[in-house]
Structures are given as C-alpha cells and as structure tokens.
Amino acid sequence: MSSVVIVGSQWGDEGKGKMTDYLSQEADVVVRSQGGNNAGHTIAFDGKKFALRLVPSGIFAKDKLAVIGNGVVINPPALLKELHYLQDNGIDISGLRISSRSHITFPYHILLDKCQEEAKGDHKVGTTKNGIGPTYMDKVSRVGIRMCDLLEKDTFKEKLERNLAEKNELFTKLYHVDPISFDDIFESYYEYGQELKQYVTDTAQIVNDALDQDKKVLFEGAQGVMLDVDQGTYPYVTASNPIAGGVCTGVGVGPNKIETVVGICKAYSTRVGAGPFPTELTDEIGDQIRETGHEYGTVTGRPRRVGWFDSVAMRHARRVSGISCLSLNLLDVLTGLKTVKICTSYKLDGKQIDYYPASLKELERCEPVYEELPGWDEDITGAKKFEDLPINAQNYLKRVSELSESPLATVSVGADRIQTIIVKDPWEFAHK
C-alpha cells in the first residue's frame, strides 16, 4: 500500500493542482474528497492551462482513475461543462469515477447561498455563492439529494418536491424573493444524472481495493487547512473538512490507510474574502507580490489578500493535519525583494504566543513577530536542484522548513511541471 494526501496548508490557492499533476504520474488512482465547484485549480499541461473546479487534477494522467469521492458536493451542469471542455481539448475522461453517495447542488442551494450572504450585511463570510454551504447544510440535516437519488426518477421527484416546498417558504417569507419552480429543475437535472450515470459507482470500494492491492493512491485536497470548518478561522471558512482527516470521511477509507500527508504552501501567504489574516501586507510590497504572482481567484477572479509567510499558522496546520512534509510553491515570486520576512510568533496584548487562537477577537489583536532575511535578485526559474538556488533563497527555505517543523519535499520555481525542484519525492515519505 502507498498513499499520499495533498492538503492545502494555508487558506487555499496554494498550488495544489500542480503538485497533484506531478505526483499523479506515479499514482494509479487520484481521488478528491471534499468541496465543490467553489474550489478552483489551474494546471499547466502540454502547453495549455486548464482551469477546473470539480474534476480531479488526475484526469490528465493517462490510464489512471480520477475519483470524485462522497464528500464532494456536485453541481451537475458545472461538472458536465468541465467534462465537455476537457473532451473538446482532447483529454480522455474515461477514467472518471463519481461516488453514488455524493450530494447534489441544486439552483435552490445557490439562491439560498446568495440570500444568506446578503442578509449578513457587513458580516459576510465571502462565499463564492455557488451553493456549497447550503448543500452541506442539507446533507447534515439529512434532507440532501445524493447522486444515487438523482438516478432514480421517483426518488428524485419525491425528494425534490419536499425540499422545494421547504426552501420556497424561506425564499418567499424570509428573504422575499421569487420561489423556484419544480419544473425548472426536475427534467433537466434528471437528464444531467443520466449523462453522468456511466461514471457513477461505489468509489469507496474502488479506492480501498486499490490500496489493498498495493497500488498507489493520491488523495487530492481542495481549499486549505485554515479554511477547515472545524480547524480554520471560523466562521470565515468553507463548509467541509480540507484537513487530511477529511479524506477518511470524504472517501470512505480508514485512517490506517493514510501514509503521507504533503502540506502545500506558498513562499508567502494569501487568502480570498473576509477573515483574520495576521501577516497581511497592504503596502507596495503586497501589491508587487500580488501582481508578480498573479494572485487573483481561479473561481471568482477576486484579488487575493497577500501577506508574509506565517509559520504560526503553518505549525497549526501541521498539527491538525499530520503534515509529513512541505511542498513549497511560487518561490520565484519573491525574487527581486531586498528582504523577505517570516512570521515566527504573534504578540497578543503584549504577550508573545506561538499558537493560533480560536477567537476572532484575539486574532484581530494579534501582531506578527517577524524574522527578516536578505532577499535575492537572481533568476531562479531554471533551477533544477536545491543547490542551484541562490544562497539567500536556500537559507529562506531552510528557515521556513525549521519554523514549520516539517521537512521540504519539493520547491516550485515556475508554473510548468518541470519547474519543480525535488528535495525528496513525496512518494518516498510513504516508505520511511
């Protein structure tokens, strides 16, 4: 058995897709376990850039299975749009597998998401308004419609009628918007299900069988640890569990099947939307990093908030997600800065702390304590091994690793797959 879990160790957008694409070359199965079409990932493949939201990045690897696990919430028209887009670009999608237990996002989830966000006024969470939270809300309320229900016309009809009756009460009486018609959803979504039916199966069995047969399984995360509904900056979080533990529930594998957890991070920090962000840069350095790193959301297009690398948040991510090693991206973006900073701890009400507070009010009062290191001007985009990097870049990476309490596995110095320095292949950590 050999398994690797990829988790975003910051606030999402860390470049998980690139590492998934790289590691999937050796994997037999690539699995996604949570999130929905709120999570965008961009992959450079064969000279083209592909922006995906639902389809696992492993779809680009030939002769592999790309699995959407039960923890993923699926918007059928959005998924079909992606599949057609891939086919139009010559990508073979025959390896796709979709869990029959995955939950479905409907138009009423999207409308409810928008209504709830607007009702929050100045306290908006900053959701993508794709209906992800309301879909998970129905799931835990035990009224959700799953993929297996969508394929059974009578079951789908019964559940849709019941859900719409409840949701339309909310729309008309609480939010004062027009109700959603049953006829606008039923036939079209049933047809979506029929088109997806060929890919629907018991994915937990597929993944467990692969592990039991000593095949390599790669679990692809979405979002990031700091957006985890339990361990992140609640309530400014996503509705699912991006931590490594979410793989177990979101795929249907036991924790003893998880061998290695790769924490994906940037050489700096970013987040989209509202919420605490202790190392945020609002000056010209932040603007420079944003423009050089093209820091705009894959899904929303919103400019990302930018900050220095936060080792306090990283250590929190390591603890709650069991990170084995780090895969650091976008080191090249820091090229040209005279100095680079790493947050080593916080000051809370004058007292130095090295933990990440749960309280939002405490986080707002936290001041980052920085360690400053000299920067570098040399072009690093062609570096093939660690020793090719300027000494100042090497020292920066070593300090990030030390403060994060995690060894470096890879360093990315450019967008292309080949622009990756392998310090130690993450698959090797599975056999330590």
Swiss-Prot record:
Residues annotated for substrate binding in this entry: 298-304
Pathway participation: Purine metabolism; AMP biosynthesis via de novo pathway; AMP from IMP: step 1/2
Role description: Plays an important role in the de novo pathway of purine nucleotide biosynthesis. Catalyzes the first committed step in the biosynthesis of AMP from IMP.
GO cellular component, as recorded: cytoplasm
Family: Belongs to the adenylosuccinate synthetase family.
GO biological process: 'de novo' AMP biosynthetic process; IMP metabolic process
PROSITE patterns: ADENYLOSUCCIN_SYN_1 (PS01266), ADENYLOSUCCIN_SYN_2 (PS00513)
Catalytically driven reaction(s): IMP + L-aspartate + GTP = N(6)-(1,2-dicarboxyethyl)-AMP + GDP + phosphate + 2 H(+)
Subunit structure: Homodimer.
Residues binding IMP, per UniProt: 13-16, 38-41, 128, 142, 223, 238, 302
Catalytic activity, EC: 6.3.4.4
Cited Pfam families: Adenylsucc_synt
Residues the entry annotates as binding GTP: 12-18, 40-42, 304, 330-332, 412-414
Binding site for Mg(2+): 13, 40
InterPro entries tied to this protein: Adenylosuccin_syn_GTP-bd, Adenylosuccin_syn_Lys_AS, Adenylosuccinate_synth_dom1, Adenylosuccinate_synth_dom2, Adenylosuccinate_synth_dom3, Adenylosuccinate_synthetase, P-loop_NTPase
Superkingdom to which the source organism belongs: Bacteria
Cell location: Cytoplasm
Name of the protein in question: Adenylosuccinate synthetase
NAD found in the keyword field: no
Assigned keywords, A-Z: Cytoplasm, GTP-binding, Ligase, Magnesium, Metal-binding, Nucleotide-binding, Purine biosynthesis
Active site: 13 (proton acceptor), 41 (proton donor)
Organism: Limosilactobacillus reuteri (strain DSM 20016)
GO molecular function: adenylosuccinate synthase activity; GTP binding; magnesium ion binding
Required cofactor names: Mg(2+)
Main localization of the protein described in the UniProt heading: cytoplasm
Note accompanying the cofactor annotation: Binds 1 Mg(2+) ion per subunit.
